[in-house]
Amino acid sequence: MSKTNFFLKYLKNINNLINNLLEKNLNKLNFKNLSFLFKNNKIILTFVALFIIFISYLILPTFYNPNNISNELKKKLQKKLDLNFKFSQNIEYNFFPKPHFIIRDSKIFGNQKEISKISKLKINISFDNLFSIKDIKVKDVVLEKANFNLNTKNYNFFIELLSKNFKNGKLAIKDSNVFFKHFESEVLFISKIFKMKYYFDSKEFKNFLYSENEIFNMPFSIESFFINKNKIFSQINFDLIKLKIDNELIFDNEKRIGKSKITNNKLKRVVEYQIKKNSFNFDFFDKKAQPKAIYIGKFNLKPFFGSIEGNLDEINLNHLFGSNAVIAQLLKTEIFNNKNINFNLNLNAFNVHNNSNFKNINLNSKIQDGLIDTDNTKFEWRDIADFKLSDSLIFVRNGELVLDGKMKINVNDYNKIYKFLLTPKIYRSQIKQIDFNFSYNFDQKIAELKEIKIDKKINQSVNKILNNVILKKDDLRNKIYFKNLLNDAIKSYAG
């Protein structure tokens, strides 16, 4: 049966329904209540007729030609969002709670390449002009369970959407994933989109983007809008680690120039950066605490490689490895345990914050093949001894951050060590070199020392005493604790 015949039959059924209602109510009439019932039934029948006509109007899109529906919706989405959609034949229409089309398994293309696969695409349409598919107006658009494939060529896909027309309808993206790829099949990282919304604010008279996401198991939110045609502002919040980033990005032909103000608890930093086709370079300033301190970062995307170098007057290790530090929290998420990440860190500092004993710190770290180490990290204890770290590995054990490695200590003046420790003279043996393996838990502040060698010889008594070192919260208590512990080990070594 054709859709036209079906529609005629549907109208006949409506007519029969009205006649049945009339007969049913007229049979109940008597001369006394004739006028009253006539008026009431007239009102009821009018509402029934209007309701049926309204429903009939709403179902008109079900009689559209499927090919015409597909073509017209693609044209209207192209005009509204400047996106090239490809639909399957699985197109559904429903008018509750408002008229809308649902397309299963659709795709978005850009430059003849697939950008996204969408499990469910919902297109809300206006109540106006449902008589013709060409006259319908697209309102809100919702993408659900979509996978976006981005790379160095289309990385600003979501930023470009912010410049589209949302005055007559929103764009929402729900329960989706973003795969950022290095090459065609090499995934660098995946970001989850819980809910994303593009909308027009009539008071501010501009478009806004608000999104709740997750990257490397770390949730964050972002809000963005254009300050002017070539300048966009974004605020990113990582509530888990109390990190906020206020970012301004300027579009200048093929390069992007940006400035970020980073707030972590009470600490404030400034980052100036530049994005080109296959590179990302930045300078990191700590203008208030250390005006001269600067970190220089370079990231190459093809092939992927990154490095950060810094020269500081003073380094605060709590900012790196403290229980609430950003880097420590990021390490716990295992964000860097990715075989596609190749990264080097080199920081030089003259002093350690709140510790006058150590100086000339050279902190080295490397991420390669999914492993993180701090090999070749060096520092000095006054002019008494030099420390060097090797065979190290940073990892997460039961949700806690752990550093394993080997430590080599070259003793420059053993007499000064004994003087510092107030060691009795009868126990002051000559020491030139100390080697040991260790495992340090940053969260519990417990160090486990093994295979301790003094001048290349293992002493079991010393190993037993220094096997478990537990740091205290109070620095003074730590100093007393260390002195007593080391003196016990020295006495045991001297016999």
Which ranges hold each PLM region?
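Extended terminal
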Residues: S2-L45, Y273-I275, K406-G495
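Extracellular/lumenal and peripheral-membrane lipid-interaction modules
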Residues: L34-Q89, L162, S461
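Flexible beta-edge/linker motif
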Residues: N41, F47, T62-S70, I91-E184, ...
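Short, surface-exposed charged micro-motifs
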Residues: N90-E92, K170, K197, E248, ...
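Hydrophobic residues embedded in beta-strands of well-ordered beta-sheets
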Residues: F101, K203-N207, N230-I232, R256-G258, ...
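Transmembrane beta-strands of outer-membrane beta-barrel pores
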Residues: K145, K266, K288, E314-N316, ...
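Elongated, acidic membrane-bridging lipid-handling scaffolds
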Residues: A146-N265, G322-L371, K378-I384, L471, ...
